[in-house]
Amino acid sequence: MDQHIAESIGRPDLIRLDDRLVCLRFETMKAVSALAAVRHLLDTGAVRRGDTLLDSSSGIYAYALALACHRYGMRCHIVGSTTVDHTLRTQLAVLGATLEQMEPCSDLKLDQKRRVERIHEILAEHPEYHWMRQYHDDVHYLGYAAVADRIRETLGSADGLTVVGGVGSGASTGALARYLRTGPEGRASADVELVGVQPYGSITFGAGHTTDPDIIIAGIGSSIPFGNVSHELYDTVHWISFDAALAGSVDLLRRHAVFAGLSTGAGYLAARHERGRSPERTVLFVAADTGHRYVDTVHARHREAVPIADLAPQEVTDRGRLALPWSRMQWNRAAAPAP
């Protein structure tokens, strides 16, 4: 029996949607990494119960860190993106977390920069606070070891598995690939490919020169370098626009009854494409959260969704040729692109 709701929320479901297409569905994915990170910090003496944990978030991590702080008797201070909605603000308030939300801003790149600047201001005022640094501290990898074990046990083996998901801070997909490839005893053995999903405008894989007229998909891209992204883990990268991700989210709900967020819709599109390219492999895509935050901006617009059969990626070998609504590039486990 779980000792706290955060443990249940962080445990994913594995759902077979179709032949060799599997959804790894979380209620709140980052709960698993936040819980393990806070537990590790307590165990190593880096923090003590009652301390204040601080970080920046566009949504999912804010809730996850608030839950972890509630579980372990810590205080939580979040500098939130403009994308934090009323429901999440209310949850954070009731959980006792402090939320500073950025002023409305149509440029999420600027929003991200302002959040980091505010973090540094808070640390100057309160040097006793512990900055969780979800974008840079690989303590956030730890929680995904148990998820990798569950995937391996459920599927019987990780061999021949392709993992697809939003890159974001790098911890989730990067950690899953690392743990699945090495196995439970640290032996490098499994044939696991990793496919990262990015929005246009993200600098993580060198697409900062592109723009999406609608919005950069919160949580899976970045306008600043992230230390937790290990580029050498990724075999392939897909860049997917808001409109294409919307179509994926709607189709996932309509076809498979999975109600999930916008990044999941993007991952679903990429996963279907990868399965078509390699029918001998099992493709697993990550659904990081439920669709409740996206009811008005995505699911209520279901009549606008393009049929996914009409969508296919443009194959590129040069990032200078990236184009909306969807591009795909073999990354081949290369190093990070030059700034």
Q: Where on the chain are the PLM-derived regions?
A:
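PLP-dependent amino-acid enzyme catalytic core
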Residues: 1-339
